[in-house]
């Protein structure tokens, strides 16, 4: 079992299989020119899998594959099957923008993927183009339906932005509700790679909007879950991920592995240690020691919390998967 110095059990590994993305979302990607890490500097699936085995053997029970956009990395379903074959009952999930999902949903399900979280910030084509900086909505919605048809459980992630999609939150909730998918509204996480002019809605503002049409009751928060859960009168539940709340980090159970091999204890901070040398030489003991060291470095909380002057993270989310 992996336990940090604050007594939090860490059983959740998020793996960024690539930092590349086929979108340029304004709340994620930098405004200035940048270059991707060369492909030859990324861990191979075999190297990633070696660390996955270490993490599972140490007590990890949940793995999520992220990016960038994970589906732009070739043969992702092969990596999914490697993990699933090693630990068939592992909670194996994927976070995606959905654009390529129509091509891969069934293959991923057959390989052992169980769940998907999909970004959907708007149902309006022009707004989608504004956010992603390309025309994407038709492909995203087609991918969503393909995932449901493949038998995957799908949650929708929506970043709530003032003046962009705040007039659509109820429509988005109803879109998810009618398809029996949970939607989670995400507070915009300030970071130095995003557009400076973006302003996010806080959880209270999101609730005020939903409450204009629905009676909303706060539900019991699941252990280790990042989202606060709310219930409508008909029993439908939606979530709000609110990293600005002071208790957001109290039950954090996750660590992150970047595509180039950096093991990251916290999304907000830049601290990380590399496992690349260890896994490239097949050093299981060395990789395990680095995992323990990163766990010891896991901070108590981020600095988005109320009372921390709303500091801005310098972390590039497209490199760590958010």
Swiss-Prot record:
Pathway: Cofactor biosynthesis; molybdopterin biosynthesis. It catalyses: GTP + AH2 + S-adenosyl-L-methionine = (8S)-3',8-cyclo-7,8-dihydroguanosine 5'-triphosphate + 5'-deoxyadenosine + L-methionine + A + H(+). GTP binds at residues 14, 64, 95, 155, 254-256. Keywords: 4Fe-4S, GTP-binding, Iron, Iron-sulfur, Lyase, Metal-binding, Molybdenum cofactor biosynthesis, Nucleotide-binding, S-adenosyl-L-methionine. The keyword Iron-sulfur applies. [4Fe-4S] cluster 2 binds at residues 249, 252, 266. Gene3D superfamilies: Aldolase class I. Binds 2 [4Fe-4S] clusters. Binds 1 [4Fe-4S] cluster coordinated with 3 cysteines and an exchangeable S-adenosyl-L-methionine and 1 [4Fe-4S] cluster coordinated with 3 cysteines and the GTP-derived substrate. Pfam families: Fer4_12 (PF13353), Mob_synth_C (PF06463), Radical_SAM (PF04055). Its EC number is 4.1.99.22. [4Fe-4S] cluster 1 binds at residues 21, 25, 28. GO terms for molecular function: 4 iron, 4 sulfur cluster binding; cyclic pyranopterin monophosphate synthase activity; GTP 3',8'-cyclase activity; GTP binding; metal ion binding; S-adenosyl-L-methionine binding. S-adenosyl-L-methionine binds at residues 27, 68, 119, 189. Its cofactor is [4Fe-4S] cluster. One of its GO terms (biological process) is Mo-molybdopterin cofactor biosynthetic process. Catalyzes the cyclization of GTP to (8S)-3',8-cyclo-7,8-dihydroguanosine 5'-triphosphate. Monomer and homodimer. Belongs to the radical SAM superfamily. MoaA family. PANTHER family: MOLYBDENUM COFACTOR BIOSYNTHESIS PROTEIN 1 (PTHR22960:SF0), MOLYBDOPTERIN COFACTOR SYNTHESIS PROTEIN A (PTHR22960). This is GTP 3',8-cyclase. It comes from Campylobacter curvus (strain 525.92).
